[in-house]
């Protein structure tokens, strides 16, 4: 019998491999993206201190619409909250997800609103 590989296990494996190579600092934090079936989350993380500097998610009150529209608004929010914390340059961590759809929408929106990566 053929067994299908668990997609989330493969994603976590990719994410761990990438996390071994990238790390965020206070000057250039890591923009981490987590995507669930219903929601999307973004965090600016300083890996040296182990601190989240800013975060945004589709749970925030001002985020409504379809999943892709929510991702765009979360990108806008994380960019504005990053600017408030005096952060412009980030390292994008797609979390092992394919750079497509909601992950791409969030990244493009964050770029358009002032984050550089």
Curated annotation (Swiss-Prot):
Pfam families reported in the protein's UniProt record: Ribosomal_L18p
Domain of life the protein comes from: Bacteria
SUPFAM superfamilies: Translational machinery components (SSF53137)
GO molecular function, one term: structural constituent of ribosome
UniProt keyword annotations, A-Z: Ribonucleoprotein, Ribosomal protein, RNA-binding, rRNA-binding
Database matches in InterPro entries: Ribosomal_uL18_bac-type, Ribosomal_uL18_bac/euk
Any one biological process term the GO annotation gives: translation
An annotated GO cellular component: cytosolic large ribosomal subunit
PANTHER family from the UniProt entry: 39S RIBOSOMAL PROTEIN L18, MITOCHONDRIAL (PTHR12899), LARGE RIBOSOMAL SUBUNIT PROTEIN UL18M (PTHR12899:SF3)
Family: Belongs to the universal ribosomal protein uL18 family.
Function text: This is one of the proteins that bind and probably mediate the attachment of the 5S RNA into the large ribosomal subunit, where it forms part of the central protuberance.
Oligomer and partners: Part of the 50S ribosomal subunit; part of the 5S rRNA/L5/L18/L25 subcomplex. Contacts the 5S and 23S rRNAs.
Protein name listed in UniProt: Large ribosomal subunit protein uL18
Biological source species: Leuconostoc mesenteroides subsp. mesenteroides (strain ATCC 8293 / DSM 20343 / BCRC 11652 / CCM 1803 / JCM 6124 / NCDO 523 / NBRC 100496 / NCIMB 8023 / NCTC 12954 / NRRL B-1118 / 37Y)
């Amino acid at each position: 019998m053929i067994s299908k590989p668990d997609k989330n296990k493969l994603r976590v494996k990719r994410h761990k491999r990438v996390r071994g190579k990238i790390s965020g600092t206070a000057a250039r934090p890591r923009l981490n993206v987590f995507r669930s079936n219903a929601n999307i989350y973004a965090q600016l993380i300083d890996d040296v201190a182990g601190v989240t500097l800013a975060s945004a998610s589709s749970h925030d009150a001002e985020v409504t619409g379809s999943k892709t529209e929510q991702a765009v608004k979360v990108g806008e929010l994380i960019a504005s909250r990053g600017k408030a914390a005096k952060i412009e340059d980030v390292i994008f961590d797609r979390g092992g997800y394919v750079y497509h759809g909601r992950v791409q929408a969030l990244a493009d929106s964050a770029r358009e609103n002032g984050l550089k990566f």
